């Protein structure tokens, strides 16, 4: 639909619009709730990480102190013996909310009046999707290799050392014939660490999902969940793992000298345009492995002093930490 009111210069190229019911009567709480809901429907790490401390975050720079239950010792008993009492000391870890992402855009009253469909919904959906991509990529890039040494490499398994989960120099070549076997080996590695069977997850890339669907055994064990939100990447279960598919897993070119690249390409980008990505990360773990806290701390509007319209801006702060490395495993695939 052509503009009824003429739009010139930078306004035609850059000014955006919103619904009239929100122009001049902006309600921050309404917008904040909407964005948070859409973000967590789309975020892999909102699903697989421990978010128990989410409500304690109020601003960037906050510190959340996490107490981990100590291990209670079990001793032999003989009749008449004096008991030795243990003094349990919780292990305290510090989660720093030191990351922040924002968006800011301009809404023009005249363009909003002509806009169809509802632009607030459209902008909120796009902001949530872009936030998902940025935060998911950042979190997974900085945690994917944070598991225990016994949970990765060519001799994985804290007790058996018998599972080849790949290395930078020698990634595992996945095929339709062996992909399920490697997933079962990831499960065994977690079993050897006594990781609980519930709340386990597996995060794979689309190429690995394709290999899974080419495996007859995988198809027999793979159960879709028609009621799950599509945009969180959840596609089914395999051997106690809830399986998620995402494009945000790190990748790297062949060889140990080349850096890993974040899923969105924003971190450690390879400068050579001729690099061929030959390594990819596949992550398995338990919900307790990574603590992740995110909060939309600012959502506000300011009237544009130079035009009829509003400036809308929002700040999302977050932090993450691998708190149980024994509950996180890594497969380096090719």
Predicted regions and their residues:
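Short Gly/aromatic-enriched secondary-structure transition segments
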Residues: 79-86, 218
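Alpha-helical scaffold segments that mediate packing/assembly in large oligomeric complexes
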Residues: 110-192, 206, 330-334
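Residue-level detector of alpha-helical recognition elements and their boundaries
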Residues: 81, 141-142, 146, 258, ...
